[in-house]
């Protein structure tokens, strides 16, 4: 029979070209030069018909034995030829049938296939492939030309991958191995097949090769990296290959291969990775790559340019996965700096004491030394020996620390009442260090210091981007750092820049993350407040945080009560130094009757009168109190309706004109009042019914009303812009019996929550809402 090759849809193997070197020669730090860097070839990607890689399929099979006698020629002629239907599977090492009978009783190994061709002789069966095997030929007939070509390319791919697995599993000469790797990469790039395994299979073969041959020279490292670089443009490296890349970053951080080849790989990882938990070595590779950038002469400037390249020149980063991935890398790297300290045998007892709170907070006594290092000479000598042998990254320079809980009578009483023997200690209580005593000093090794400085600096860079700051604040709100880092002065001092950026941001979704995630846990506000473990500036950052929080929606009794219970001393000290925010805080505490103790009230008044700004604001407070007494004096109307189009200023002017102590029903329907009028409404002591129909009264105003008008019985919010954020606050108004939320942004969940928490609620209007 006359069998000839065909072009298979016009696709042919490319010719491999060797072009100019990718990186040229590069001078090493010590003045010596590396060997010539391997060349990078101009690779022409396949541009013809594309096919999906077949793993299995139905096809007709005919086997022909090579004729050796006249009788066998007759028996194998086309007139006696027989076709069998088979469901064939293209396994990793052979071609097998789901029904191993007839021609396919035995599987056909790829190593036994000498050639794969398309049949094109005259009068040949249509859409056939010819597999040349020892002693005969196997014909495969597809249903159409596309399926025939798909089978042809899939069989060729499986056969070649099988061959490369065999060849590269036993390397002898690395010159030959490198040539085979380049050919393998070219084959993958030029293949007309489309499948994830087309690029992943060569990477896994090379990855296995590298994992089994660890004693490679630097030149061989770089040659292999450059050879496989084209495959990494659109694919993540396998885990073993990540280990190889990490090793190269650690050993040759100044290699140009790191910049030329690894940069696009890391950029792709940061843009497309969805979960480092499923591929932790990708995170480790990214971490080592950034550290390699930091080792260059420009250092952090190179890292800064890399972060800028990830963000892009526009105001908003177009890649939503970049920030979470960079933060994940930073958190893991920072934890690694303290990992040996956490796991250290010598330090574990006292750290366990700190973390688990073996002494109850309310029962702790001051000046109880907790030994971190034993002073026994034998133990010290043993420690020195072990240090020299394993290069410890953490040294504790003091022999003892004194842990002291911040004392506040009110807080301690609450802790005694609410905390059981097995409760988790408060983070601040665990880490407060008595300033008068010998403090713990965590000294990291030079390498750990560089790692810490690099990644804290990256967090500072991230906080400088306006579009990244809200997401960064949410990611850092749970304080995802080890307690040992929070006890490290260097770390908290550097991280202060990030917290300062949060405190300066006017957006509520940013500065609200300064507070704790949930009740009973500490947030950045507590850590950087006076008495907190991270406070080193006499409360300047604390004042900034209070200022921004009070300026949004946190001017509430609950927030002021928390400050009065926990931070009254620092507030008074800062007010004494003329801080206007703290002066305002003290005035609000007096105005809202937060402070019940007369002596404390007198002390606050004395503090206010000690500065010009405090004296002025206290006088204004006294004027407001006199006006409030006049307003709340018995008398005046019991019902009042403002004209339509009235504003907040009109309402304030009206309420300042006389006594409204008897006012029970106030209608502001169809006026132009906003949430700002809530400050006037809370001055009405007898108010029972409030109509805000079709006004601009919003969530911020509802929160104020819910704290002060707890006796309100009827509230009409029809056609107001209130949402779940404000409506949830109504759950504290237990006297409400009639509530109109018609045409608001009420959700079904919030409605159910309000019904459960308002026992006196009888009439509710939720028409034209999600809860309707």
UniProtKB/Swiss-Prot annotation:
UniProt keyword Ribosomal protein present: no
Location(s), subcellular: Nucleus; Cytoplasm
Keyword line: Cytoplasm, Leucine-rich repeat, Nucleus, Repeat
Start and end residues of each PH domain: 52-160
Entry-linked InterPro entries: CMIP, LRR_dom_sf, PH_CMIP
GO cellular component entries: cytosol; nucleoplasm
CDD domains: PH (cd00821)
Top-rank taxon: Eukaryota
Name of this protein: C-Maf-inducing protein
Native organism: Xenopus laevis
């Amino acid at each position: 029979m006359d069998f000839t090759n065909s072009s298979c849809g016009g696709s042919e193997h490319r010719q491999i070209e060797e072009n100019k070197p990718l990186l040229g020669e590069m001078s090493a730090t010590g003045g010596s030069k590396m060997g010539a860097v391997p060349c990078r070839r101009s690779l022409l990607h396949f541009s013809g018909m594309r096919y999906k890689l077949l793993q299995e399929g139905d096809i007709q099979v005919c086997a022909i034995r090579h004729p050796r006698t006249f009788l066998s020629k007759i028996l194998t002629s086309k007139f006696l030829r027989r076709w069998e239907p088979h469901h064939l599977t293209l396994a990793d090492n052979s071609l097998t049938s789901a029904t191993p009978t007839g021609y396919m009783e035995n599987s056909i190994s790829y190593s036994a296939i000498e050639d794969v061709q398309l049949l094109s002789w005259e009068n040949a069966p249509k859409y056939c492939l010819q597999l040349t095997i020892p002693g005969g030929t196997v014909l495969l007939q597809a249903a159409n030309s596309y399926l025939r070509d798909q089978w042809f390319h899939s069989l060729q791919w499986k056969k070649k991958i099988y061959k490369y697995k065999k060849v590269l599993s036993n390397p002898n000469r690395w010159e030959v191995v490198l040539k085979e790797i380049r050919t393998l990469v070219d084959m993958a790039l030029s293949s007309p097949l489309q499948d994830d395994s087309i690029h992943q299979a060569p990477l896994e073969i090379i990855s296995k090769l590298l994992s089994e041959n660890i004693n490679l020279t630097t030149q061989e490292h770089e040659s292999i990296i450059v050879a496989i670089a084209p495959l990494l443009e659109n694919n993540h490296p396998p885990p073993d290959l990540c280990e190889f890349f990490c090793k190269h970053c650690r050993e040759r951080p100044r290699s140009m291969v790191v910049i030329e080849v690894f940069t696009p790989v890391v950029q792709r990882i940061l843009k497309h990775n969805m979960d480092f938990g499923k591929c932790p070595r990708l995170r480790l590779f990214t971490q080592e790559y950034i550290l390699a950038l930091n080792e260059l002469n420009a250092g952090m400037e190179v890292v800064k340019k890399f972060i800028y390249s990830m963000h892009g020149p526009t105001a908003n980063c177009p890649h939503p996965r970049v920030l979470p991935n960079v933060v994940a890398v930073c958190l893991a790297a920072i934890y690694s700096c303290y990992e040996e300290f956490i796991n250290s045998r010598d330090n574990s007892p006292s750290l366990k004491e700190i973390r688990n709170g073996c002494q109850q907070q309310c029962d702790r006594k001051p000046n109880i030394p907790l030994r971190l290092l034993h002073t026994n000479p034998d133990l010290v000598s043993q420690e020195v020996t072990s240090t020299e042998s394993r290069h410890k990254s953490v040294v504790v320079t003091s022999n003892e620390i004194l842990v002291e809980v911040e004392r506040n009578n009110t807080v301690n009483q609450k802790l005694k009442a609410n905390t059981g023997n097995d409760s988790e200690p408060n983070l601040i209580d665990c880490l407060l260090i008595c300033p008068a005593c010998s403090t713990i000093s965590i000294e990291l090794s030079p390498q750990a210091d560089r790692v810490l400085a690099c990644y804290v600096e990256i967090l500072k860079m991230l906080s400088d981007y306006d579009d990244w700051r809200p997401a960064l604040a949410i990611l850092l709100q749970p304080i995802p750092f080890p307690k040992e880092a929070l006890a490290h002065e260097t770390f908290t001092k550097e991280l202060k820049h990030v917290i300062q950026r949060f405190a300066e941001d006017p957006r509520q979704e940013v500065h609200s993350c300064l507070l704790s995630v949930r009740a009973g846990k500490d947030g950045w506000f507590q850590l950087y407040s006076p008495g907190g473990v991270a406070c080193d500036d006499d409360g300047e950052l604390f004042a900034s945080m209070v200022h921004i929080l009070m300026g949004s929606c946190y001017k509430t009794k609950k927030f002021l009560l928390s400050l009065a219970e926990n931070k009254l001393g620092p507030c008074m000290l800062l007010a004494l130094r003329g801080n206007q925010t703290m002066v305002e805080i003290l005035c609000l505490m007096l105005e809202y009757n937060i402070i019940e103790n007369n002596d404390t009230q007198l002390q606050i008044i004395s503090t206010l009168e000690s500065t010009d700004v405090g004296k002025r604001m206290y006088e204004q407070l006294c004027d407001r109190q006199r006006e409030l007494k006049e307003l709340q004096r018995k008398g005046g109307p019991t019902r009042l309706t403002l004209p339509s189009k009235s504003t907040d200023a009109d309402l304030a002017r009206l309420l300042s004109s006389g006594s409204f102590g008897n006012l029970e029903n106030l209608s502001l329907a169809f006026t132009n009042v906003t949430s700002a009028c809530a400050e006037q409404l809370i001055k009405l002591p007898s108010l029972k019914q409030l109509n805000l129909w079709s006004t601009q009264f919003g969530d911020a105003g509802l929160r104020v009303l819910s704290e002060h008008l707890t006796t309100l019985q009827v509230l009409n919010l029809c056609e107001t812009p209130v949402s779940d954020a404000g409506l949830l606050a109504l759950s504290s108004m237990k006297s409400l019996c009639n509530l109109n939320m018609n045409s608001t942004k009420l959700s079904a969940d919030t409605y159910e929550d309000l019904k459960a928490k308002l026992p006196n609620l009888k009439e509710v209007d939720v028409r034209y809402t999600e809860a309707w």
